[in-house]
């Protein structure tokens, strides 16, 4: 029930036909006087722009044309010749005018189609036939009723006699089922049914004493039913008639307090009827049962016309004599956010003089007991997350009861089976059989090669497996056989024993690529063998020096004799005696061997290729082989890597070789190299590289399969390919024990393409009901991945087990040992629903303070107490003489939200005043179930959040008496407040004073107050009895019980104390909790002399609709609120408040504003001057007040106090947003500062907020 748009006109109106964006045609109402006393009459067209969530300023007409007279009625119909149709106007001067809507919208001068004046007096009503859009019925003064054909508009024919009648035809309506039946209602009370085909009167209803008829409407589905309305203020009735009994109405609808002026029966749902009248109200009825659903917001003058939108019945419009046509919706919006903002603003504006001059329009809301017919569905089905289909069917045809069925559903059953098979195989752990199976069923050579390589990696010696896969095992055996024929690998006996091999495991002598120094194992023990033959005597004597040696021989011999093997090596190398040099190097150790090898390789410039390979192997520089070997020998390079590469370099060497193959692939597009590169990446465990190749292969194979498939769908093909990819990656990760080191990163992942496939696969398997499998793969994706986070949350919600609900007894009590003599606790609570319906108003709470500014437990906007009265449209509360007057502190933390209610059964700190008992003749309040309550729970008729803007405050809107229940013939729901919040025990409030003098008023707390100790919070169970705690000592006695009957908290009948002009209203107080915990205030000294003096507030006054907050920090963290300027001096304490520190510079001085704050001053002051120069004179007070508050801000900036640097920076950004007319950004910054930095806000914050609003409204 939200007002979406307003047209500022006192006019009759008509909706545009068709499904296009709705337009409204308005014609100046005859006899009405506008605010300017203008006598101009015109026809205007308005574009409602309902597709836009918000509109700035008033609506402006899109077309306008002046007329000769005012309008009594308007009608708009479709036309074959005009896309936008034809508009007909019933004018006060008796003219019937027709306009072309297309030409009006185009601004054409010849928009008038025709102008006829067959009526001798004013035309009162007109309507197009719903079946034949060219037929137009018009009724007017002296009983004249004409039927016009648009094809021959100049020659209408008249129904009924030509004799003049004294009564006027005030209304008419075509039958919605029978095209030639028409009904009219006259001022003399005649309701006549006409047969246009025979041009005769069919029957006249006995209209209950011939009371005047102001409106008539046919049932949209039943051709014999209609409703009529009477405009009499003494007896406003809506009568439902069935033509089969024309002597008496079938039923009467009573609810209006004054005459009914308009009716509109919904064409899409015959159970919905709108009525409006002289009581300023628009009501919604069920004419089939006579039940009144509720009423819409009351306006300030008669509502003379209401109409459903003919195409979209979610909308309707109502015209009233207060100068507005309101376009509303029957749907509810979530108003809690808007209410919170309104309460917050009201709290901020609590001291403002003009804030109290305006009142909020009455907010009415009700819920239909069943959805409208156009929203009903006899059956429906939807796909649910997790492989489920939810279907709804009627239990029995014709009944409203439905049954819900949830069934599993799989798009492709093969997907589910393959997923289960793979997961089962993984649990068994037989990876080799998986690889063998997938390789055997591979669809391409590349896929088969991948599985074979992964299988090779499973072996205990992966490198040996890779070499064997490359086919080098057979070649090595062949080379060994060839060498055996040469007799180079015979095992020789040394000292009668076979020499043992010096190589490692599996290495044979003289195998391919073995070192030339390992060919003869006896070389390692050459010298030792010579030494072992110490005692042997041979027949081959020799001379160390025989005189024929050259200088080189002598040098080598001398060096050997002295053990200087390095010098001997140098001489041998210099003489190029490589054989001798290598033998000497063997004796000299590793250093000499390395030197001899280096010299040897330097000399071999034109040597065979194996020499360079040998150099790389000996020098442990396999990078030379990887980067420089021809790619046609990549297998040989890979075999060398598997044989000689260090473990730490092996992966990088394989990756480098694979990169070379990929680069060559891009150059010559040889698809075979992609498989070779994949092998290298697999061997090096480079998942990020091989995944890119696999995904590319997936796309190609998928496209090829789609082109050749006969029966498979594209989805099934894609899912099977995706399944294969996931299986390969999963097995590869397990085989190589891959660890993803980037899961903690927030972006720039190397495996981002794989993560996308994981998310896609998780979505597929989740769609097939495998939520656990989906969760498993989503856990492999980084936590900060946005899409994975959404998917994980969906699965978490889908797999969440429902919490078992404990049944609450109807009335639960908690038995505890009494700590002291308890106050009497009558069981005043009655079980009700956990959510009270959004009633327009409730009985004022007899123990809620009228305006407790020092209340530390002011409630948030969301009520969680089932006994809390709704605050949707509560009237102003009477001034409570027992409530302390409100302090006018600028410290109003409106953004503060108390924590949640404590757990059940917690011990309270103390009671307050118990709820008053019900009178003995009262019965428990009936439970009313509504579809929409003041909660965050959505209902069927909720609009999207933010669709409609909150109602704008208007001046002088009466707070009309509201209905306590949206359903008639039911007793109003009495609501009870929750138990008092936590706090120390305060004495009970005595009866009202009998004297004439007002009680002393307390305007500020004592300067020093003790901090409250931390105690358990009170129970959240609304049905539990209130536990007791010992009362505090008091100068007054505690009454034995609370008397029944009128509440002792009501104001005394004589001479109530004057209300504090600056005290915020209860709604404002509810949104302005104090951040400090207040201790009980001791009674004033004068209290001893007056036993009826009011008690000071206890710690945390009780306010309805508030969950008990936890204990707050001690009062040193926030200063106590200051007294209002106009409040009386405190009588509660002789202590004085500390005087505020004087400013460094006088007010108005702007010469000391720092540079970073200067944009705030310059932009805001300039925009304030712009608003001030263009604002209407009637808003001068508001503009001046906003300027005054901005000057407070500028003073703070000039003194460099209150505002911190980050707040000044945000204010500068806010100012620049205002300068750029980006008011949404400015408002967002304003709310952020007000919410998160409340200690820096003050009166100046209201000025900034008002400047944003005024600047937005100022052109």
From Swiss-Prot:
Gene3D superfamilies: 1.25.40.1030, Functional domain of the splicing factor Prp18, YVTN repeat-like/Quinoprotein amine dehydrogenase. Residues 977-1003, 1045-1061, 1105-1123 have a biased composition (Pro residues). WD repeats lie at residues 5-47, 66-109, 118-158, 164-204, 208-251, 255-295, 298-338, 382-407. Keywords: Cytoplasmic vesicle, Endoplasmic reticulum, ER-Golgi transport, Membrane, Protein transport, Repeat, Transport, WD repeat. It is found in: Cytoplasmic vesicle, COPII-coated vesicle membrane; Endoplasmic reticulum membrane. It comes from the Eukaryota. One of its GO terms (cellular component) is endoplasmic reticulum exit site. It is a peripheral membrane protein. Pfam families: SRA1, TPR_Sec16, WD40. GO terms for molecular function: structural molecule activity. Residues 822-845, 868-1154 are annotated as: Disordered. One of its GO terms (biological process) is endoplasmic reticulum organization. Residues 834-845, 924-939, 950-968, 1004-1014, 1062-1079, 1129-1138 have a biased composition (Low complexity). InterPro entries: Sec16_Sec23-bd (IPR024298), SEC31-like (IPR040251), SRA1/Sec31 (IPR009917), WD40/YVTN_repeat-like_dom_sf (IPR015943), WD40_repeat_dom_sf (IPR036322), WD40_rpt (IPR001680). The COPII coat is composed of at least 5 proteins: the sec23/24 complex, the sec13/31 complex, and the protein sar1. sec13 and sec31 make a 2:2 tetramer that forms the edge element of the COPII outer coat. The tetramer self-assembles in multiple copies to form the complete polyhedral cage. Interacts (via WD 8) with sec13. PANTHER family: SEC31-RELATED PROTEIN, SECRETORY 31, ISOFORM D. Belongs to the WD repeat SEC31 family. Component of the coat protein complex II (COPII) which promotes the formation of transport vesicles from the endoplasmic reticulum (ER). The coat has two main functions, the physical deformation of the endoplasmic reticulum membrane into vesicles and the selection of cargo molecules. This is Protein transport protein sec31. It comes from Aspergillus niger (strain ATCC MYA-4892 / CBS 513.88 / FGSC A1513). The gene is sec31.
